[in-house]
Amino acid sequence: MSKIIGRTTATPVPRSDWNQIDETKVDFIKNKPTNIAFISEEDNEDIVVVETASPYAGTIHRFTVEVNCAPMYIPEDNLGPEFNDDYQPYTDYGVLIFPDSYTDKGNKTRLVISAHGGGGTVSADSSQAEFQSISRYLVANGYAVMDVNGLPEQYAIDKGNLRLQDSVGSYLAMQSYIKAYNYCMENFNFHPEVFLVGISEGGITTTNIVLHTHIPVLAQAGWSPVLDTYNQIWLDPWPWCSVNGPGAVLANVYGFEPVESPASTKDRDKWIYDEKKIMGYNPMKCNVTTGADGLEYRHYRCPVKFWHCMDDETVRYEPTEAFIKSIQNAGGTAYLKLYETGGHETAYVGDPVPNPLGNTIAYDGTEIEIKPVCEETFLFFKRFE
């Protein structure tokens, strides 16, 4: 069993002398994990073992993965030996935030994949995850948090300066998350099973991780999630992104046919949406059947809980409601909490929680304001530890 106590240069000492450790050699940090060292008590032993913690503990680690951005859709008339797959490697950025309690050996740390929304990115030197309340709260309570951009920067430039924020949960994004997950498992001391949290456009990313990857997921949470490539991204994208926004990313990544004489400069008028080319990466069309009773039945491989505001005009709540109901119809574990008001800012609905269950001091030493959806996400994950 391990007890994290603080910085120490002390050598192992008998248990009877724990209270006599030279205070000049120990900087005690009470009731708060630290990234410096820990003392572990071996069963049936009268020795205190002092070990130095990982240099990654309490740090933000940046990394890259290589993504093959060659087109993936194969037309029916190209299934013969004449068709050759291609390799077009691009670099995508990743971020990994370690809790103070992380160690290179011994007890494993739980990893959370936190997929950024359409207002954030992961770059060479920054990420949305570092500033989100849920990421900071999870890290403060012993979780590691990982994200990637999901749309390689140079690829976005080569395709006409696509919005870097819009990974749209595509097969390119799935490659990036799979490779980032494998990187984390191969190089760090993490449990293989992860939690997922996605905010806004991060909702379609995390949902496609569940539907299209081998990553083992304990549970998924989503705030105001995007779930429908056609109705939410193509027909009704966020108001400020109708031109060269997520629709343009869909068109370029999936190879939509261009319109010869577009009716407007809007993305939805410049290309022809093709559900077949989406190849199942539209969650609303994936893994769902309609029963004789007219109801939709969706088999989903992990528990899921979404939060959404009914007056959200950026990402409508109705697809979220339909998605959750289809999982419930099939006997799955799925929950939806709806707020009457709050718009697209689910994260800020309600008064701060007066007595959060977890530690609220972030890795930078600041106090985290915990709103209801943040606390409820934390508690939801705790159910499946």
Please identify what each model-predicted range represents:
Residues 306-308, 312:
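Short beta-strand/loop motif that positions the catalytic acidic residue
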Residues 124, 231-296:
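Mobile cap/lid helix-loop segments that gate and shape the active-site cleft of serine hydrolases
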Residues 166-188:
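Alpha/beta-hydrolase active-site loop
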Residues 1-35:
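Short, low-complexity N-terminal tether/leader segments at secretion or assembly junctions of large
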Residues 186-187, 192-241:
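Primarily recognizes the serine-hydrolase "nucleophile elbow" in alpha/beta-hydrolase
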Residues 40-105:
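N-terminal cap/lid segment of alpha/beta-hydrolase-fold proteins
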Residues 321-324, 328-385:
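C-terminal catalytic histidine-bearing segment of alpha/beta-hydrolase fold enzymes
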Residues 104-108, 117-156:
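Short substrate-entry loop that stabilizes the transition state in hydrolases
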